[in-house]
Design a protein with these regions (language model features):
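Conserved SF1/SF2 helicase motif Ia
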Residues: 48-51, 63-90, 103, 182-186
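Conserved motor-coupling elements within RecA-like helicase/translocase cores
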Residues: 113-131
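Conserved helix-turn-beta segment of the N-terminal RecA-like "Helicase ATP-binding" lobe
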Residues: 86-111, 204-211
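Conserved pre-motif I regulatory segment
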Residues: 2-46
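SF2 helicase catalytic motif II
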Residues: 130, 134-138, 142-189
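Conserved Walker A/P-loop ATP-binding site and its immediately adjacent core
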Residues: 54-55, 75-96, 135-138, 194-200
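Conserved interdomain linker/interface between the two RecA-like ATPase lobes of SF2 helicase motors
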Residues: 178, 186-237
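Walker A/P-loop NTP-binding motif
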Residues: 35-39, 43, 54-72, 178-181
């Protein structure tokens, strides 16, 4: 019998309904990355600004968390941003679709501005999704009980990876990723970028675990269509 399914079939019904309610359709690169991530594969997504790459990075995590809610607090997805302001912004933007889809998730950020009380609570009761920076991750990894905190980690998302990987910040983060790979061997690594000069090198930097296939490189066909209008004044300005 011929396969009559569509690429969108990898999305559960309530996810498809969420896209449809907004007059959207998931883009090909979003579905391709979601499929790779659900298979446990690491990947590098190259998509222009407005291409929906941030949502693409999180879709598989949201699907997994919707299908199998955790019986105890445990970190599922770690998002790493070059800027603390971006981490906080993505946290806010991610909470809206999660709530609209009907997911009961804890999505929190951990930056230099996070109060000490919130940091302590996160250690004792990890959120489902944590958004942070390379420096905050390095501090966390160097702390006691870090291995147990990250043991259940399933996904690491590195946003604007082209801005982090080169230089000292990239070296610092690479050490952190090596620790995460050791503590959570089933974890996948997702890199997001709008522009990459050497995608092969960056993909290899993303996941260097021996015996693992090289991360897949996924390229978006194009960004969102611009919605432009011209305002013409009848009077002289």
């Amino acid at each position: 019998m011929a396969d009559t399914g569509t690429p969108e079939d990898i999305l559960p019904g309530r996810f498809r309904d969420w896209f449809s309610a907004r007059g959207w359709r998931p883009r090909a690169h979003q579905l391709e990355l979601t499929q790779a991530a659900l298979a446990g594969d690491s990947a590098l997504l190259i998509a222009p600004t407005g291409g929906g790459k941030t949502l693409a990075g999180f879709l598989a995590s949201l699907i997994e968390l919707s299908a199998a809610p955790r019986s105890r607090p445990a970190l599922h997805t770690l998002y790493i941003s070059p800027l603390k302001a971006l981490a906080v912004d993505v946290q806010r933007n991610l909470m809206q679709p999660a709530e609209e889809i009907g997911l009961d998730l804890r999505i929190e950020s951990r930056t230099g501005d996070t109060p000490a009380a919130a940091r302590q609570r996160q250690r004792k009761s990890p959120p489902d999704i944590l958004l942070t920076t390379p420096e905050q991750l390095a501090l966390f990894i160097a702390s006691a009980n870090a291995a147990s905190f990250f043991a259940d980690l399933r996904c690491v998302i590195i946003d604007e990876i082209h801005a982090i990987a080169p230089g000292k910040r990239g070296d610092l983060l690479a050490l952190g990723l090596a620790s995460l790979a050791e503590w959570a061997p089933d974890c996948r690594f997702i890199g997001l970028s709008a522009t990459v000069r050497e995608p092969g090198e960056l993909a290899n930097w993303l996941d260097l675990r021996p015996g693992c296939a090289a991360p897949r490189t996924i390229r978006a066909a194009g960004g969102a269509r611009a919605d432009l209008s011209i305002l013409v004044s009848r009077e002289r300005i």
